[in-house]
A protein has these predicted regions:
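Gly/Pro/Ser/Thr-rich low-complexity, intrinsically disordered segments predominantly at protein N-termini
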Residues: 1-145
Length: 145
């Protein structure tokens, strides 16, 4: 895996900060957790949102409310390989944010080893997680353009 660049870290940290400030008490925002998808499969997403009632190490794919990957050098891998893994394990919503352009690919809902929909959303548009509609963010608001 490639080392994370400066821009990647800024986007990841700002996103985590904004989500944490907006999240209700029943939603936990986990930065870079070990996410156990199955007995032999785990990934470390940049941000994982899940019900606070479930401890982060116990969260499985279908428990997740939102998984976010910020991609700088790993964009193709995050859009293909990780999307297949997350879909196959029932993650209901998966975002890939291009750290350079702030374009976001919103994958929903899982269907087998893929997602039924994966539109690309511009940074000036409001991103609203389907499982956590109280959280909304426009990546333009991060002030990184």
């Amino acid at each position: 895996m490639s080392p994370k660049g400066r821009r990647h870290e800024i986007v990841r940290l700002e996103l985590g900060y904004r989500f944490t400030r907006q999240a209700s008490r029943d939603v936990f925002v986990a930065p870079e957790p070990q996410f156990n998808l199955g007995p032999d499969t785990f990934l470390v997403p940049d941000v994982l949102l899940h019900p606070r009632a479930i401890a982060t190490p116990d969260v499985r794919g279908s428990d997740a409310l939102l998984v976010v990957e910020v991609a700088e050098t790993s964009l193709a891998y995050d859009l293909k390989t990780k999307a297949m893994l997350y879909a196959a394990h029932g993650v209901p919503e998966y975002w890939v944010i291009n750290a350079s352009t702030l374009m976001t690919t919103m994958h929903t809902p899982p269907s087998g080893n893929a997602y039924a929909s994966a539109p690309e959303i511009a940074p000036d548009k409001l991103l609203v997680p389907t499982m956590v509609p109280g959280l909304a963010i426009s990546l333009d608001s991060l002030g990184l353009q």
